[in-house]
């Protein structure tokens, strides 16, 4: 049986799904890509206006309709509540950080006053405004080539993208600055993929489970649980970053932040706990953010 791997049709999405296809073939499972068009691929409105699941619901619908056997998502795009219809596998995470692609090799600090920077993510907008209130932040949608092309053409001075995406399509050298999470905190589960199949497909589950990376799973789950407990969606100005440390890599450090869209206020809290219990640590961090006033910032 040849597995039908559903993916969005962008260069980045097909590259990501292609890597998963090749890994499955390495484990002896034949697979091919099936392109599924999502509302987010055809509607260039701000993502928060299109609705929840803008990049993922069409793939899940295709799974339910038996049009595909496996769906490959960017984990950060999935709704935060687990869906009992699907089995989830999370492979090894790429670099979670954000990157700046600027003209003339400039860093954020070196951009001239009033420079035009493109991004549509509220999380990035709020943090950029806190770091550089003088910048003109402009909305930006489209694939990686389209976004970076606005810098090449001079329409924008810089854009901010996920470094993982740049790396996956071989464009990591275009980054003029890669932000430390302490400077620009990434989105929950940024850089991680989510692979889903139907829960009743036991043979497919056995094959997909070979791709599971436990450390990526627990750190991404911790970050996304913060988002869930804050009752915020993937487009909210919320960031989170988890790492595993300790002698056996069994201690998790989880930092999360909630930001005012105008950059005027930010709430950040960090805590450590057992890596094997990511939800408990996330609930602790979310509770502290709520106590500090996160609900007010989230509107």
From Swiss-Prot:
An example Gene Ontology CC term for this record: cytoplasm
Q: Which residues cross the membrane?
A: none
> Which residues get modified to S-(dipyrrolylmethanemethyl)cysteine?
234
InterPro entries the UniProt entry points to: HemC, Porphobilin_deaminase_cofac_BS, Porphobilin_deaminase_N, Porphobilinogen_deaminase_C, Porphobilinogen_deaminase_C_sf
Keyword entries, A-Z: Porphyrin biosynthesis, Transferase
Q: Which pathway does UniProt place it in?
A: Porphyrin-containing compound metabolism; protoporphyrin-IX biosynthesis; coproporphyrinogen-III from 5-aminolevulinate: step 2/4
According to UniProt, the reaction catalysed is:
4 porphobilinogen + H2O = hydroxymethylbilane + 4 NH4(+)
Q: So what EC number does this one have?
A: 2.5.1.61
Q: Name one Pfam family in it.
A: Porphobil_deamC
Top-rank lineage group of the source organism: Bacteria
GO MF, one term, reads: hydroxymethylbilane synthase activity
Q: Indicate whether Flavoprotein appears among the record's keywords.
A: no
Query: Which of the seven top EC classes does this enzyme belong to?
Result: transferase
Set out the biological process GO terms recorded for this chain's protein: protoporphyrinogen IX biosynthetic process
UniProt cofactor(s) = dipyrromethane
Give the function comment from the record. Tetrapolymerization of the monopyrrole PBG into the hydroxymethylbilane pre-uroporphyrinogen in several discrete steps.
User: Per its UniProt record, what PANTHER family does this chain match?
Assistant: PORPHOBILINOGEN DEAMINASE
The UniProt subunit note reads as follows: Monomer.
Q: Name the family.
A: Belongs to the HMBS family.
What more does the record tell us?
Answer: The porphobilinogen subunits are added to the dipyrromethane group.
Name it: Porphobilinogen deaminase
The organism encoding this protein is Corynebacterium efficiens (strain DSM 44549 / YS-314 / AJ 12310 / JCM 11189 / NBRC 100395)
């Amino acid at each position: 049986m040849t597995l039908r791997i559903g993916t969005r049709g962008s260069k980045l999405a097909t590259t990501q799904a292609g890597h998963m296809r090749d890994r499955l073939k390495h484990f002896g499972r034949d697979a091919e890509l099936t392109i599924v068009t999502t509302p987010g691929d055809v509607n260039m409105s701000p993502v928060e206006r299109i609705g929840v699941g803008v990049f993922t619901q069409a793939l899940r619908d295709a799974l339910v309709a038996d049009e595909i056997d496996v769906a490959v998502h960017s984990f950060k795009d999935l709704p935060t509540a687990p869906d009992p219809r699907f089995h989830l596998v999370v492979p090894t995470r790429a670099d979670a950080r954000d990157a700046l692609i600027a003209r003339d090799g400039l860093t954020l600090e070196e951009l001239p006053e009033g420079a035009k920077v493109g991004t549509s993510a509220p999380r990035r907008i709020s943090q950029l405004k806190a770091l550089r209130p003088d910048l003109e932040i402009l909305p930006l949608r489209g694939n990686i080539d389209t976004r970076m092309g606005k810098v090449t053409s001079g329409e924008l001075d810089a854009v901010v993208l996920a470094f993982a995406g740049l790396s996956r399509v071989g464009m990591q050298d275009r980054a003029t600055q890669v932000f430390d999470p302490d400077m620009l905190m990434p989105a929950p589960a940024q850089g991680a993929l989510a692979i889903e199949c139907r829960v009743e497909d036991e043979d497919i589950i056995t094959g997909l489970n070979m791709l599971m990376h436990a450390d990526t799973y627990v750190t991404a789950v911790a970050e996304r649980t913060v988002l869930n407990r804050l009752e915020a969606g993937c487009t909210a100005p919320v960031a989170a970053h988890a790492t595993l440390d300790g002698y056996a890599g069994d201690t998790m450090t989880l930092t999360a932040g909630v930001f005012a869209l105008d950059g005027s206020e930010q709430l950040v809290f960090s805590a450590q706990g057992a890596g094997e219990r990511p939800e408990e640590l996330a609930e602790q961090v979310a509770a502290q953010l709520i106590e500090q006033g996160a609900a007010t910032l989230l509107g």
